[in-house]
């Protein structure tokens, strides 16, 4: 996902209740404003109901992207509780759940790979749990036992006054294992498309990530930069410094792959973040150009249109 000219785009939220005219209008608006890239979250809950797949709502979006020449980052988002799980789960709940996730990926990738506008698959929305220990499900226990068998005994915290970071190291490994599992399935189904992730809360979740391992199965690396969520250690005057810092961290850890700002706060937030913030046009432009000056191939705003439901409803829109 390398570009000769930095790209600017936005997340398009596709939701039940939108008409084909609504969706066409979103992509026409992108085209008319020089935005040639967009991101779509592929809600499994919108496509799989009553044991049947119905892709028609998202087909409208992909056809509109084809029509207006907009390239798409498609974020895999298996079925979850949409009302209470805004960002998506980080790990499967069980072996059976992993099989359901695989079935979702197989169905979605196999169907949407037909569209010319599809550019890259975002393997998981905002991986990283910020140090939260892995819940030992049947799947996690199986992976943990295999991993622990190869874990150097001298690094285990069994001695006197020796810090034990076994669980933290397993979190990093398990995150890599799960992302690689998704990447292998996606590559097998659609080898011509890119594979991408967008780490978030970078200053707090950085130990969760093993970027050298990711470089073996990703084609680009991104980040989520939201002033209302991720900039707690900065004053508002220092927000551009935060954008620069986090961009530098991701660019360095992309290890030669292209890096993007996959999500940048583009609109007002009063209730669905840690810090209410209503950026002006001048602020937004400063954050945009700071990211591009840091070497980003492109910036995708969160988001073009406001969501109609859940915690983010009525907020974030450009």
PLM regions: where:
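Hydrophobic faces of well-ordered beta-strands that scaffold small-molecule active sites
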Residues: 6-12, 36-40, 72-76, 119-123, ...
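The substrate-binding groove and active-site-proximal loops of carbohydrate-active enzymes
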Residues: 6-18, 41-56, 85-102, 111, ...
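Aromatic- and acidic-residue-enriched carbohydrate-binding clefts of CAZyme catalytic domains
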Residues: 32, 51-52, 75, 79-99, ...
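Acidic (Asp/Glu)-rich catalytic clusters
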Residues: 2-3, 26-34, 59-69, 108-116, ...
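Hydrophobic targeting/anchoring helices
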Residues: 196-198, 204-318
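Aromatic-lined substrate-binding rim segments of carbohydrate-active enzymes
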Residues: 23-109, 173-194, 287
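Polysaccharide-binding and catalytic clefts of secreted carbohydrate-active enzymes
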Residues: 92, 111-245, 249
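Short, acidic/polar
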Residues: 16-32, 100-109, 201-214, 279-290
């Amino acid at each position: 996902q390398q570009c000769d000219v930095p790209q600017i785009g936005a997340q398009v939220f596709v939701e039940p209740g939108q008409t084909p005219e609504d969706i066409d209008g979103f992509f026409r608006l992108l085209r008319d404003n020089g935005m040639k890239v967009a991101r779509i979250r592929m809600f499994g809950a919108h496509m799989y109901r009553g044991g049947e797949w119905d892709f028609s709502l998202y087909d409208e979006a992909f056809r509109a992207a084809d029509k207006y020449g907009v390239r798409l980052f498609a974020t895999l988002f298996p079925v979850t509780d949409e009302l209470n799980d805004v960002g998506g789960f980080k790990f499967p709940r069980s072996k059976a759940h992993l099989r359901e996730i695989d079935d979702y990926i197989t169905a979605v990738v196999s169907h949407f790979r037909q569209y010319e506008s599809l550019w890259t698959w975002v393997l998981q929305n905002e991986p990283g749990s910020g140090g939260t220990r892995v819940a030992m499900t049947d799947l996690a226990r199986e992976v943990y036992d295999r991993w622990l068998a190869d874990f150097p005994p001298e690094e285990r915290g069994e001695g006197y006054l020796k810090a034990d970071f076994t669980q933290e190291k397993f979190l990093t490994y398990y995150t890599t294992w799960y992302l690689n599992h998704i990447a292998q399935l996606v590559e097998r189904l659609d080898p011509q498309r890119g594979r991408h992730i967008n780490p978030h809360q970078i200053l707090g979740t950085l130990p969760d990530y093993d970027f050298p391992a990711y470089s073996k199965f990703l084609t680009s690396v991104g980040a989520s930069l939201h002033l209302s969520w991720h900039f707690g250690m900065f004053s508002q005057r220092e927000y551009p410094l935060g954008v620069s810092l986090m961009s530098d961290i991701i660019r360095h850890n992309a290890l030669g792959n292209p890096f993007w700002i996959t999500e940048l706060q583009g609109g007002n937030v009063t209730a669905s973040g840690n810090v209410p913030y209503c950026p002006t046009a001048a602020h937004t432009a400063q954050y945009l150009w700071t990211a591009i000056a840091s070497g980003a191939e492109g910036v995708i705003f969160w988001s073009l249109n406001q969501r109609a439901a859940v915690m983010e409803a009525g907020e974030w829109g450009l």
